[in-house]
């Protein structure tokens, strides 16, 4: 070999160099190849405002593992990257930056604002892309896309116009979710609900005829200003005679009717509900049924409108306090009751959402939802784990029309134009329009589309649609979507119906759902808790491979996982073990070593390691097929650390020391298995495996494009199981010596009672090397009553005690140890029988004490056994 592996594992020394080598070689860029099967993943496009966080790191690691595995398995693999324009988040960042300059966006106008936005995107938008590269993401960067690039914009207009012409998109005045901070409408999926402590204000609304009043309760007394009716259930005998009568609205003194509607629950509260069509979605529907007036009482930033001078300009919560005081003064307030209820908040800023009636653009969802439901029911797309089917179905079966217009400037401007002269409206792909009726210039709708409208088209718009490109025909439908369970509603559902509607096929075969990365205590990472972990800092300290391997081994589809530095350190230690083992092997190869594959006439221990590798290759392939990435990585870890490093390398040392043909055969097998396990590990830890591969092979190829190991029946050696018996026997001797606290340096005879004497005579050298045996005797029967014994499924082993320990001294030591353990047992038993301790101590402390007791009991049993032996 021309090169030598560095003395210590220092990932900073080679990770950037390796990544550049891959990228420059074109390894990430697939081609349309009819001889190869395509495998496609589209990246969930991170926001241009974003910085890499642990959720991204998990998401990208899982995708990269699948892509690298499929690439090595002979597929034409496309991992298509890109970023999302993120309307609300990006606009908020730019508005905040302008605020610091003392400028409002309205001061400079739309065009100047958009110039700033594009400049901001150019400056910061690529930041997260560079961070993804640090992780080792093998995306095809030549195909990188942006949700507002020319191609995506073309697709957005095409879909909008198609839906509009088919009656699937309409403009109407409906109740929507309004964020008073972001100053835009948001969709139902963008509203997050949280339980908040609030109140029920019990109020009296007097009848106009003076015959009495109706009592009702509300959690939002400030909306009373917009009440246009009070409703009761038509079957409620208490109020049947009052339906149709008129009430006087407190404070406002407006006349409002009593209406009968099935929406009202008779057994909830008094069975009377105030109806505010402009500020409650259910009230809006009641208002439509009864032709009620819709009165908006709030401005865009949730302040009371000028129509109510006493409260005009007050924030909604400030107005609430004033209105409650005035209701009290008027005698309309009966009581205030504590009440906790679900409150909708904006998923972007956390502000309480204000339901309000507004003229917006909507997508009719029912016709689009059913095909998306059928596709999963028919197995065209499957969720992993399957339990997420239920969430997907529930959302689609209860879906409402999707509000797609946003009162923002950054985003895809709605391609609708209005004529202010004659009132005509047209929807067109053109950037400017002339009125077809009167010939006057038309004004484009100022609103932009919901960010998720363009993201919904991502699997096909990025491949050239609406043009029928070769890439689209070859790489669509995509194969696997990897995403968190938190965006099933936002993104997965919308891609499903968009793909089916516009392409006639599902956008992906499988949706692999992962959970959140939580902190060590199981808490969600957040700015407010200050418990977020920066993946780039982890990479800087431990290397990208350590972070990737920790995320892979901790992953089970659909489940949350916990991050800890200790887990990353363990992964780093594993990388270090691999590095040192590889260095040892290469240092023991001659300079002119030539690799010629696996030699013939293998020794038993060689056939054992080859069979073990063949078995693990088969299992890992099966695990990856089932998306059991965590299980697969654990099996590779066990093979490399326990089987190859701790056993096989040690088994070959006598042959390497002996030299000659025996040494050459051992070297050849060591390298054959090493090459295979580097390939097996590569998708999980790409950098270290490539660096070792480059040194091992003198750069003859790159491991990234090598073939992934698969099961081969010719490497299933029937007698490999025989050597497993030898391993079990050595392990049993080691365990027995450890129990007796005998150091490895102290050697003793080993007598093996077996019906297979030749197996153990031929492997005696391994007992001497690995079990501290001074000599190995093999026979069918031994009579050694004073010897220590160890038993496996195949043999009984005797170790003469007099060669290991002074029996009297050892008994005295064990007795002293037993007395100490008995004291611990007495103390812990007394503590855990104390009812006061059990009642007052934290649950974690009680559990910890119980664990100590169990450990002490186990130790006592072990000591008794040793003394009896």
Language-model segments: which ranges?
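Feature 926 captures the class I aminoacyl-tRNA synthetase adenylation module centered on the KMSKS loop
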Residues: 202, 394-453, 457, 501-544, ...
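Short, solvent-exposed turn/loop segments enriched in Gly/Ser/Thr/Pro and often Arg
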Residues: 34-36, 44-45, 78-91, 144-152, ...
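Extended active-site and interfacial segments that coordinate phosphate-rich ligands
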Residues: 57-65, 214-250, 273-280, 290-296, ...
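Non-catalytic terminal extensions that flank enzyme cores
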Residues: 1-54, 77, 334, 347, ...
């Amino acid at each position: 070999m021309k090169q030598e592996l560095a003395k210590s594992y220092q990932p900073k020394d080679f990770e950037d160099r390796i990544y550049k080598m891959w990228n420059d070689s074109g390894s990430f860029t697939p081609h349309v190849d009819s001889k190869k099967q395509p495998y496609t993943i589209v990246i969930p496009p991170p926001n241009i405002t974003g910085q890499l966080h642990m959720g991204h790191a998990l998401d990208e690691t899982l995708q990269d593992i699948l892509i690298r595995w499929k690439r090595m398995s002979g597929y034409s693999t496309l991992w298509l990257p890109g970023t999302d324009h993120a309307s609300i988040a990006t606009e908020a960042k730019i508005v905040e930056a302008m605020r610091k300059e003392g400028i409002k966006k309205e001061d400079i106008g739309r065009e100047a604002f958009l110039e700033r936005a594009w400049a901001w995107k150019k400056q910061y938008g690529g930041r997260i892309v560079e961070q993804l590269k640090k992780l080792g993401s093998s995306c095809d960067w030549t195909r990188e896309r942006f949700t507002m690039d020319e191609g995506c914009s073309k697709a957005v207009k095409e879909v909008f116009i198609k839906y509009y012409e088919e009656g699937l998109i309409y403009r109407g005045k409906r109740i929507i979710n309004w964020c008073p901070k972001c100053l835009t409408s948001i969709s139902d999926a963008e509203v997050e609900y949280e339980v908040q402590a609030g109140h029920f204000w019990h109020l009296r609304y007097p009848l106009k005829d003076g015959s009495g009043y109706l009592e009702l309760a509300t959690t939002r007394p400030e909306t009373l200003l917009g009440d246009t009716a009070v409703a009761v259930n038509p079957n409620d005998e208490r109020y049947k005679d009052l339906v149709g009568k008129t009430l006087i609205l407190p404070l406002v003194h407006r006349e409002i009717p009593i209406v009968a509607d099935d929406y009202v629950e008779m057994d909830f509260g008094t069975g009377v509900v105030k109806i505010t069509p402009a500020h409650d979605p259910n009230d809006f529907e009641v208002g439509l049924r009864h032709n009620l007036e819709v009165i908006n009482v709030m401005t865009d930033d949730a302040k009371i409108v000028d129509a109510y001078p006493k409260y005009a300009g007050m924030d909604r919560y400030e107005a609430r306090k004033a209105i409650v005081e005035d209701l009290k003064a008027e005698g309309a307030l009966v009581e205030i009751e504590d009440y906790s209820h679900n409150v909708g908040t904006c998923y972007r800023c956390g502000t309480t959402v204000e339901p309000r009636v507004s003229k917006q653009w909507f997508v009719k969802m029912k016709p689009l939802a059913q095909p998306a439901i059928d596709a999963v029911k028919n197995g065209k797309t499957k969720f992993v784990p399957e339990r997420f089917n239920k969430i997907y179905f529930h959302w689609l079966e209860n879906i409402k029309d999707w509000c797609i217009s946003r009162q923002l400037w950054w985003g895809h401007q709605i391609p609708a134009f209005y004529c202010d002269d004659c009132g005509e409206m047209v929807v067109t792909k053109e950037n400017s329009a002339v009125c077809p009726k009167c010939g006057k210039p038309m004004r484009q709708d100022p609103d932009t589309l919901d960010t998720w409208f363009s993201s919904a088209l991502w699997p096909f718009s990025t491949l050239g649609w609406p043009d029928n490109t070769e890439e689209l025909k070859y790489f669509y439908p995509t194969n696997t979507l990897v995403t968190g369970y938190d965006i099933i509603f936002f993104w997965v559902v919308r891609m499903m119906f968009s793909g089916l509607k516009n392409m006639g096929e599902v956008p992906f075969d499988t949706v692999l759902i992962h959970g959140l990365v939580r902190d060590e205590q199981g808490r969600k990472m957040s700015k407010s808790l200050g418990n977020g972990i920066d993946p780039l800092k982890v990479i800087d300290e431990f290397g990208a491979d350590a972070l990737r391997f920790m995320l892979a081994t901790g992953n089970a589809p659909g489940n949350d996982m916990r991050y800890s530095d200790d887990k990353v350190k363990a992964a780093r230690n594993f990388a270090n073990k691999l590095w040192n083992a590889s260095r040892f092997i290469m240092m023991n190869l001659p300079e002119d070593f030539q690799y010629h594959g696996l030699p013939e006439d293998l020794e038993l221990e060689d056939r054992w390691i080859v069979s073990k590798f063949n078995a693990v290759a088969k299992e890992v392939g099966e695990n990856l097929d089932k998306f059991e990435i965590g299980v697969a990585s654990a099996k590779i870890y066990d093979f490399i650390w326990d089987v190859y490093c701790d056993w096989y390398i040690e088994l070959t040392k006598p042959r390497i020391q002996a030299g000659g043909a025996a040494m050459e055969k051992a070297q050849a097998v060591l390298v054959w298995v090493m090459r295979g396990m580097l390939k097996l590990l590569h998708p999980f830890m790409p950098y270290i495996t490539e660096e070792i591969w480059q040194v091992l092979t003198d750069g003859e190829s790159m491991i990234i494009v090598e073939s992934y190991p698969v099961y081969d029946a010719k490497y299933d050696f029937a007698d490999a199981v025989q050597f497993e018996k030898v391993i079990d026997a050595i392990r049993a001797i080691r365990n027995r010596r450890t129990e007796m606290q005998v150091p490895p340096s102290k050697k003793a005879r080993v007598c093996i009672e077996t019906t297979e004497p030749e197996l153990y005579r031929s492997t005696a050298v391994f007992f001497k090397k690995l079990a501290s045996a001074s000599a190995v005797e093999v026979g069918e029967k031994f009579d050694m009553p004073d010897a220590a014994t160890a038993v496996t499924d195949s043999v009984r082993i005797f170790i003469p005690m007099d060669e290991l320990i002074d029996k009297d001294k050892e008994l005295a030591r064990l007795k002293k140890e037993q007395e100490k353990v008995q004291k611990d047992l007495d103390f812990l038993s007394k503590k855990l029988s104390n009812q006061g301790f059990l009642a007052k101590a934290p649950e974690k402390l009680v559990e910890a004490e119980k664990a100590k007791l169990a450990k002490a009991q186990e130790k006592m049993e072990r000591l008794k056994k040793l003394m009896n032996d």
